[in-house]
Amino acid sequence: MKTLEELNLVDDFLVNSLTSHKIYGEQSARYILECILRRQIGKLTVVPQRFFCGENTETHGIRLDVYLDEENGEIFDIEPDQNDGKEEIVSLPRRVRFYHAKIDAGNLTAGDTYGSLRNVIVIFITTYDPFGLNRMVYTIKNGCIEVPELEYEDGAQTIFLYTRGREGNPPEELKQLLHYMEHSSIENASTESLKKLHRMVTAVKRDGEVGLAYMKSFEREERIRRQGEEEGRKAGLEEGIIKLSRKLGKEDTEILSLLQEELQIDEEQAKLILEKYQQ
């Protein structure tokens, strides 16, 4: 795991800490948005790591990295993403579809008309090419297949920004911002605006509260990793005991006793383990 000093703005912890910071939050979020959208943005309320829960324990919820609410305007969600696994990339459009659905559902209260739904722009900033065309900007909106020129305005828009894309003649300021987000050093702060952003990033990294939060997140990830390793070791031991016992022709009663002895568990737990490997 990187140290806090080593983090770049494309790391979700840092961009979340920056945009939610009590001093630098709104101005940093505004600069990033205005650079991406190339227009002015109104007063912003930043909701770091906004949660939209599932309807019940059986349904999926989401956690949004940087949720931005423009006063009397649009809703924005900024999602830095470095998870370049094949399955994750293929499912990205469906993931975005779900994000839009949850954001809309969370902002339409009882009695509201559908016409009152606010415009929502979900922005993914990725260090991988989500569609393989080497474009820096992919802007996605719903439309009509039969009549492409038909104006179909449902208020939903998604922008994928590939930090290393070259095709499509992206604006120079956007190229510089995305390069800085992936490599957040003073050497890559090539404009006055980026130098100002870098000063904010540096100040946030030196903030004691941010450092404490990062240390806690590091400890939490370490606990999860160790727990996963322990569970994996235990599962491997369970399977090994059962497979070896079967090879040696041992009866289930003998295997149960061996499981209890080796794993320090009671008979009921041993039976559950044995049943698991008989399925």
Predicted features along the sequence, with ranges:
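Short, charged alpha-helical interaction segments and adjacent helix-coil junctions
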Residues: 1-6, 13, 67, 76-81, ...
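Upstream accessory/linker segments immediately N-terminal to the RecA-like ATPase cores of bacterial MutS
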Residues: 145-146, 153-167, 171-172, 176-183
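Accessory alpha/beta interaction modules
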Residues: 1-157, 167, 223, 227
